[in-house]
Amino acid sequence: MSSPQLLAVLERAQTLGHIGSGSIQDFVGHARAHISAARPALDTHWCDLGSGGGLPGLVVAVERPDVDLSLIDRSSSRTAFLGEAVTYLEVAPKVKVVNGDATELAHKNTFRGVFDGVFSRSFGPPAATAECAIAFLANDGQLIVSEPPNEDPRRWPMKELKSLGYADLEIVDGPPRFARLISAIQPDSEVPRSWKHITKRPLF
């Protein structure tokens, strides 16, 4: 059962258009499945890439208060909402809200190569998500991506993933389904490219 405070926050996010229509309880269940897929170790450092209305980030914050968590989003209205939600849910200082373009933040020392894991519910297509996330991950970090229900082996080509610095890919069948990518090495200094270049010329 979800806390009334968390449900109230997510209902507010839905009213504001930060999350889509649908059952809030279903959204919470899906966010919890992110945690099950990731199995974060105690006291590790994670980020929610493109946190939006706080899925899965706010659920992770409530369910796993030991985890240091950064909620990253480029929209000032969404990060303003997330800041209020973090205060209301009393999950600070373990949870920080970061406003900015992920492709720019990933080149800053504060964020580059420092996270044990990255959650991605709906950040972007696989190529964009993989290219942005690898720069945030420490070696042996994991990227957890929400997947569509039907398998498509073309979504995550291993050759291109290895060129970015990933070592392994596992599909968690669920349901719900997730892709788990493990980082091996730090990417080249130009990774990630700007969002314009990533979307116009995806790596795969």
For each of these PLM feature ranges, what is it?
Residues 103, 107-117:
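A short acidic, Gly/Pro-enriched loop at the edge of an enzyme's catalytic core
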Residues 53-66:
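Conserved SAM-binding loop of SAM-dependent methyltransferases across substrates and taxa
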Residues 155-204:
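SAM/dcSAM-binding transferase cores
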Residues 91-102:
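Conserved SAM-binding strand-loop segment of SAM-dependent methyltransferases
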Residues 128-142:
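A short glycine-rich, Lys/Arg-flanked "PGG" loop and its adjoining helix->strand segment in the class I
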Residues 68-73:
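Conserved SAM-binding motif I beta-strand of class I
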Residues 1-47, 77, 84-90:
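Class I SAM-dependent transferase core
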Residues 140-150:
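Conserved beta-strand signature within the Rossmann-like core of class I S-adenosyl-L-methionine
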